[in-house]
C-alpha cells in the first residue's frame, strides 16, 4: 500500500514573520539566548505558545510550534551568514559566494592583466533582518552603494608597465550600523573623498590599492569601538539616572519626615505654652482666693467665740408663765 505524500504547507508570509520578530522583541528577556539567563523552561514554553497563537490568528494555514521555532532558526541563520560576510569583507577577506575567482581582484580593484575584475556585491540587510540582528546582539557594517555610477580612471603608460593593473573607482558612501539597546539601530556615515576626474592619468602600483583598503577597515573598526563605547556610556547614563531618581525619592521622603517632625515640634511647643498659661492662671486665682479664705475663716472663728443671747421676760409671761413676775 502506497504511503500518501505529505502535503507541504505554505511558506510563512511577511505578516507572520513580522509577528514572530515583534513578539521576540517584546519577549527577548525570555526567549533570546543572551538575555534569558535563569528563566525557567515553563516561562519560555508559555512565551512560545503565545507567539504561536498570534501567528495562527493571521496565518492561512494552521502552524505548529516546531514550525515557528524552525522559522526563527532560519531567520537567525540567514542574518548571521550575512553578518559573517560583512565581517570578512571588513577584515580584508572576500565574503563567501560574493565574487567569482577572476584573478586577485578585491573590492574596488581589478583582477588579472586583461581588465577590471568583478566588484564585490555589497551586503544589504532588510529592515526586518536589521531588527533580527539587533535581537542577536550582532554589530554589522553595511556598505550602501552610492547613487553615482562607478567611473574607472584611465591609467598612464607608466602604470601599464606595472606588475598589476589598478582601476580606481569611486568609493561609495559607507554606512556603519551598530546594535544598541531597545531595538534601536544607530548608524554613522563616513564620507569617501571626492572621485578623481576620468581624464587625469594616475601613476600607481597595485600595492597602493591594498594599502588604501586598510584605512577603510581601520575606520570601520574605530567606528565599531566608538559605537560600543557610546552604548556603554548610554547604559551608564541610564544607571546614573536611576540612581539619581532613587536619591531624589529618598530626599523627598526625608523632607516629608523632617516636615512631620517640625509639625510635631510646633504642636508640642504650643501644648507647653498652653500648660504654662494654665499654671499662671491657677497661680493668680490662688492669690486672689487666699485673702477671701482668710477673711471667711476669721468670720467663722468670731461667730464661734460669742455666747448665746438671753430670752426676753415678756415673752416668757406671754407663753404661760406665772403673772407674778409681770405684777
Curated annotation (Swiss-Prot):
Describe the subunit structure.
Interacts with HARBI1.
A Gene Ontology term for the protein's cellular component: mitochondrion
- Give one GO biological process term: regulation of mitochondrial membrane permeability involved in apoptotic process
Q: Where is this region: Required for nuclear localization and apoptosis-inducing activity?
A: 1-70
Residue ranges with Gly residues bias: 104-118
What is the name of this protein?
A: Nuclear apoptosis-inducing factor 1
Q: What's the source species' lineage? A: Eukaryota, Metazoa, Chordata, Craniata, Vertebrata
Provide the primary localization: nucleus
Q: Give the start-end ranges of region Disordered.
A: 87-118, 303-327
Function of the protein: Induces apoptosis.
| Keyword match Nucleus | yes
Coiled-coil positions: none
The species is Macaca fascicularis
Per the record, the similarity remark reads: Belongs to the NAIF1 family.
Q: Does the record's keyword annotation contain Nucleus?
A: yes
Q: Which InterPro entries match?
A: Myb_DNA-bind_5
**Which superkingdom heads the taxonomic lineage of this protein's source?**
Eukaryota
Where is the protein found, in the record's own terms? Nucleus
Q: Which UniProt keywords apply?
A: Apoptosis, Nucleus
